[in-house]
Amino acid sequence: MVRMTKNVLVSVAWPYANGPRHIGHVAGFGVPSDVFARFQRMRGNNVLMVSGTDEHGTPLLVQADKEGVSVQELADKYNRQIVEDLTGLGLSYDLFTRTTTSNHYAVVQELFRGLHDNGYMIKETTLGAISPSTGRTLPDRYIEGTCPICHADGARGDQCDNCGNQLDPADLINPVSKINGETPEFVETEHFLLDLPALADSLTAWLKGREDWRPNVLKFSLNLLEDIRPRAMTRDIDWGIPIPVEGWQDNNAKKLYVWFDAVVGYLSASIEWAWRTGDPEAWRTFWNDPETSSYYFMGKDNITFHSQIWPAELLGYAGRGSRGGEVGDLGELNLPTEVVSSEFLTMSGSKFSSSKGVVIYVKDFLAEFGPDPLRYFIAVAGPENNDTDFTWDEFVRRVNNELANGWGNLVNRTVSMAHKNFGEVPVPSALTDSDQRILDLAASTFDSAGADLELSKFKNAITQIMHVVGEANAYIAEQEPWKLAKDETQRERLATVLWTALQVVSDCNTMLTPYLPHTAQKVHETLGREGIWAASPQIVEVTNESPRQPVGVGLPDPEHTYPVIMGDYQAQAAKWERIDMVPGTPLNKPAPLVTKLDPELGETGPEWAPVQS
């Protein structure tokens, strides 16, 4: 049966540009999305994977003050660091950009104008939280207090994680600023609010059709509709995107809410990718074609913005609420096919926190261990469905027992014996039941693991693949090719056993490619194959040019340069299918594939790592 090519948009949460990435960040948004995108490309699908650094909002202003630099200098610094972190991890973005671009400003303003013209942006006087010491607006998430509904402590100004209800900062009992602990002042201020109640029926109908979502995501999203209210989409702040309304766009003291603009980034990045690759309308394939599937990857703390705010923006822009309206110039834009949310990766039971010293930075981790051990750990032991605690002991155990003793051992001893005894892929003779059994298991796992990957069940899929690795090692132990090699009368049998093992190594390497792309490239070459098997992302320096221009004051410098992540992933050979091991193909002598770690590392971690409690 011929499989039809699909268009797949992979939208990845935008990391906030106030510091380098730690492993908790990439466990939630980074590795799962890349495994999914690489798998979809291997299936022959047309994939667009986009993201970028989120660079607006009060937290960036606060951090810039701490470091004694301008907010743009701070954004530039951490944008580059994050780009380097994610490239080093092998995250295969078609475009990883940033929110301080002329293109992003213009696309965000177009979405706001469409919502405003259709009547879904309503102007109201609200109570805004202000820091008494700085006079700056305090973001909802930077205010904590007691929930007025369930009375749980630690509720944020946007929602209570304990009961799931949406809140306003002024609702909290005994609110305090997370930045400096002071009690905020609440002052009257005029803002534009997204009229969520006018979009509630459309949101509800759409969400109730998402029965294939992860149960926790769907339940949380439906619960948000029980107390839906208009939500402010502008802020009293001088750093952000101008509000494209006459009388507002030249007011440098009011800007669009950072979360209104951040979620539009998936669209603006797609538009930027299209014109940077020479086909300015190519983005429409992923946004206007209703047959396209779109997947959004993030941590669980961002579900609200992806299952309520962003869909509401898209519905309102298309005039699909109780107020009606016209479809904007960008056309009717696709709603998310699935919101794929991960739980939290913790350390010693605590959330990763740079300020509290509970942090393992991606850069340090990569320098010590390389990318694939971290990618493997996140895939097999990460927070896919539950909060997961990272310990050095568990990391060392997984690397040594599963990657080194399991996968690395299978590759090295299989290829070493074949190289030593034949120098090439040997010619098999008649297969025994044992030979056929392991070959059939590997072949069937393409289907079963592939089905799990289609559903973003990354743990299930890699567990199945590593089961084949274990069975292949057991097959070799049972067949004892080292003994066959000593008996000249068993040379045909030796050739058959090693050909069988090589075929299973090839199959497992193919299936592990989305998880371990760097290792997969090495195995590909060891098996005597040439060319790019698993393509790597590249850092490209670009200028802030844009065919779309924003309006207002405080706009990005059109000549500003910055790094983006791109890649030629069409050049890779990897396909999600068995590649026959052709007898006579020269083999290369294998180098150790996975370095075993000192068991003592499991007790203390590296010298640079925080002490485990």
Swiss-Prot record:
A molecular function GO annotation: methionine-tRNA ligase activity
Gene3D superfamilies linked: HUPs, Isoleucyl-tRNA Synthetase, Domain 1, Methionyl-tRNA synthetase, Zn-domain
Keywords: Aminoacyl-tRNA synthetase, ATP-binding, Cytoplasm, Ligase, Metal-binding, Nucleotide-binding, Protein biosynthesis, Zinc
Record-linked InterPro entries: Anticodon_Met, M/V/L/I-tRNA-synth_anticd-bd, Met-tRNA_ligase_1, Met-tRNA_synth, Methionyl/Leucyl_tRNA_Synth, MetRS_core, MetRS_Zn, Rossmann-like_a/b/a_fold
EC number annotated for this UniProt entry: 6.1.1.10
BP term (GO), one: methionyl-tRNA aminoacylation
Regions annotated as coiled coil: none
Required cofactor(s): Zn(2+)
Residues the record lists as binding ATP: 354
Enzyme class, spelled out: ligase
Main location: cytoplasm
Metal-binding listed as a keyword: yes
GO CC entries: cytosol
Entry keyword annotation includes Nucleotide-binding: yes
Cofactor info, note text: Binds 1 zinc ion per subunit.
Catalytic reactions of this protein: tRNA(Met) + L-methionine + ATP = L-methionyl-tRNA(Met) + AMP + diphosphate
Sequence motif: 'KMSKS' region, positions: 351-355
The organism's place on the tree of life at top rank: Bacteria
Residues spanned by motif 'HIGH' region: 15-25
Annotated function: Is required not only for elongation of protein synthesis but also for the initiation of all mRNA translation through initiator tRNA(fMet) aminoacylation.
Subunit details: Monomer.
UniProt record similarity statement: Belongs to the class-I aminoacyl-tRNA synthetase family. MetG type 1 subfamily.
Protein name stated in the entry: Methionine--tRNA ligase
Origin species: Corynebacterium efficiens (strain DSM 44549 / YS-314 / AJ 12310 / JCM 11189 / NBRC 100395)
Upper classification of the organism: Bacteria, Bacillati, Actinomycetota, Actinomycetes, Mycobacteriales
Gene name of the record: metG
